[in-house]
Regions:
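Glycine-rich phosphate-binding loop of ATP-dependent small-molecule kinases
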Residues: 1-214
Length: 214
């Protein structure tokens, strides 16, 4: 089963990805992880990517495709995979389709987890972490027993810079701008499933299982 996971920041992507790969016994292919692995291992592809990153430039689509398809050629992907962070552009999606078609394969389902902007802002800006032990809380979903104080060690809870309103709004805007053309592309292909991401983590996963089958 070849899957793509589209999920905005704050919508529980990590949790759903972990549940999907465990249930369906397929590898989780995260673009970020592949890039880091190639760079760490000093591969030719990693060196090329590092040059662009060092220069503060975006890694070109062609190189992203090369790095992703190199990973998809590994043996553990022969019975399926869950793609996360790839494709990011229509060009990448088209190249992925060509790559899979050449192997007599295709993308079976694109899981689009949808959460409205207001809910995402609450989720992202409500996160608090302990300044000492790193324990994680949320002012709405997992509040500490005492406001602003860590349940674990009693230290002060802080809001990370990444979780402030401006950064959160920017992350959501970038995701929406990047993902809309992809959603349109897969709508035309007829292989996308839209999932309401506001129903709770377990309900979202049960919906995914209902779509993919047991």
């Amino acid at each position: 089963m070849n899957l793509i996971l589209l999920c905005p920041p704050g919508a529980g992507k990590g949790t759903q990805a972990a549940k999907i790969i465990e249930k369906y016994n397929i590898p989780h292919i995260s673009t970020g992880d592949i890039f880091r692995e190639n760079i760490k291992n000093g591969t030719e592809l990693g060196k090329k990517a590092q040059e662009y990153m060092n220069a503060g430039k975006l890694v070109p689509d062609e190189l992203v495709v090369e790095i992703a398809t190199d990973r998809l050629n590994k043996d553990d992907c022969k019975d399926g995979f869950l793609l996360d962070g790839f494709p990011r552009t229509v060009f990448q999606a088209e190249e992925l389709d060509k790559f899979l078609a050449a192997k007599g394969s295709k993308i079976d389902n694109v899981l689009d987890i949808d959460v409205n902007r207001e809910e995402l802002m609450i989720r992202l800006t409500g996160r608090r972490v302990c300044s000492k032990c790193g324990a994680s809380f949320h002012v709405v979903n997992i509040p500490p027993k005492q406001e602003g104080i860590c349940d674990v060690c009693g230290a002060e809870l802080i809001q990370r810079k990444d979780d402030n309103e401006e950064t959160a709004a920017n992350r959501i805007e970038v995701y929406n701008k990047e993902t809309k053309p992809l959603i349109d592309y897969y709508e035309k292909a007829g292989n996308i499933s839209h999932i309401d991401g506001t129903t709770g983590l377990e309900n979202v996963f049960n919906t995914i299982v209902g779509i993919l089958g047991e």
